[in-house]
Swiss-Prot record:
Pathway assigned to this chain's UniProt record: Lipid metabolism; phospholipid metabolism
Topology of this chain in the membrane: Multi-pass membrane protein
Family note: Belongs to the PlsY family.
Top-level taxon: Bacteria
NCBIfam families named in the record: glycerol-3-phosphate 1-O-acyltransferase PlsY
Keywords, comma-separated and alphabetical: Cell inner membrane, Cell membrane, Lipid biosynthesis, Lipid metabolism, Membrane, Phospholipid biosynthesis, Phospholipid metabolism, Transferase, Transmembrane, Transmembrane helix
TM region(s), chain numbering: 4-24, 56-76, 80-100, 115-135, 154-176
The reaction(s) this protein catalyses: an acyl phosphate + sn-glycerol 3-phosphate = a 1-acyl-sn-glycero-3-phosphate + phosphate
GO molecular function, one term: acyl-phosphate glycerol-3-phosphate acyltransferase activity
EC number: 2.3.1.275
Subunit comment: Probably interacts with PlsX.
Full protein name: Glycerol-3-phosphate acyltransferase
Source organism phylogeny: Bacteria, Pseudomonadati, Pseudomonadota, Gammaproteobacteria, Pasteurellales
Amino acid sequence: MSLFALFYMLFAYLLGSISSAILICRIAGLPDPRQNGSHNPGATNVLRIGNRKSALAVLIFDMLKGMIPVWAGYYLGLTQFELGMVALGACLGHIFPIFFQFKGGKGVATAFGAIAPISWAVAGSMFGTWIFVFLVSGYSSLSAVISALLVPFYVWWFKPEFTFPVALVCCLLIYRHHDNIQRLWRGQEDKVWAKFKKK
């Protein structure tokens, strides 16, 4: 990697470190997502403890954190491997944010945003997998884990030169879902729409 690419990856990490869930909850007067619900600063938890508008705002912001640096990297002349590492940097920032004691979200939306400029076919396959599993199961976490397991194969099929960095991103996603995987195994994971059924 070039020196410029390393600094640009650092920029992507810093951008990823801006936790939209925490900031939007503060602005909207909602509880701290790190202390309520699933204790995860992400769109799904904001939906649990807040409302659809706030959750949608978090989702869009988190996707843009990954999408903007990768998309801009194309025009800055970064190599394919460097673009993949920029995507990894953005996801690392979201998961381990320097501005919030390195305690961040799961990284799914940011990973989707980072992968989209790399390949819309891969992004579409990832989104389709997530939606299918979610509609069948009702578990956002299960949808994310299965998507993360399959995305490296989608990348290998459509854009093989990005397989290694994207596989690293997916390993991070699965690692961040280890608590969810244990709850799923024990049958203790909450379905996303459970909140709305209680109303």
